[in-house]
Amino acid sequence: MFLEKRQLKKELFVFLIITFAATYLLDFMVYMIYGLKTTSNATVWGLTPVAHMLFPAAAAIICMFYFKSSALTRETKIVFALFFSYMVLFFFETYVYPIMGTIGVLPLASSVIAILGFLTVFMLHLKKQWRRGLKPSRLFIGKNLRYYIILPVAIFTVILASLILNYITGLGVPSQEFNLYLFFVTFINMMFMGIFLLWPSVFGEEYGWRVYLQDRLFPLLGGYRGVLVLGIIWGIWHTPTILLGNNFPGQPILGNVAMIFFTIAVGIILSYAVLKTGSVWIAVLIHLIIDMMQVPSETYIAISIHPVFSFGSGIYGSVIIAVFSIILLRSKVWKNLKIRESN
């Protein structure tokens, strides 16, 4: 058992070193080349957080090959190959030249790869043998499929209520008008786009944090301590982005504190979802819902006047999400995850 724990720690630390080094180095390079975010470089800085999101899964995949993971089946390698193809092309199109132009701000060629990847994952679920090949790497859609409805609807409702509280309490105002109908219409359109075009970036975070890191932290620390540490790591990973003015503009210190509160609260929900289903895809779906709510909520519900002390992704919003998270912590799914010392 000592050797197993030592191996888990080794895989964990190598993953964290790659993920943090790549993310922080990218931010440093973009800052040195483009400076702080302005109207002239808004596209690059807007896409850089998307690029960040690809690093955790990339680090996880590198570690899986380096440490010769048994989860690297043929089907898994196909998905990983498409993910890396997207990542390489996305970086080239973002920081060098968009080969086929753009869809809005998104590079077109890498978007085509994203659609191809989505269709490939779908097709790999059509045969039992292929699904079996995806299961060890948690790329199979999983079990307890009712949670694909229950949890996304629940988190959407909780966050929507939190966002509306920003408007009701005067902590925020919409950039256009308060209109829930237009919010829903815009959100649905963005979700449709996100599922096909943005899933690789969300997968990038969730496969790294909720699969690779989670599968190593929980056996070492147990479910409760593991999910807390995972949330803290996830929050700290956002530090350079916040220092450079994203997420919580003008709040480099309090912004990082608010982010860590938020990632702990949301991280519990995402980890619970993966533990209940055995699949990364439910975490991808929930994360995508949270991200896709941002633009329509700012337009038709409220933009926070003070991003830290507010509902939504602010501290007040994190408290509301935390109430839901604490309810999930009562589940038995968190128990018996730690390696037994006596074995």
Please annotate each region the language model reported.
Residues 19-35, 91-93, 160-166, 331:
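Alpha-helical transmembrane segments of multi-pass membrane proteins
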Residues 249-256, 280-281, 286-343:
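C-terminal membrane module of polytopic membrane proteins
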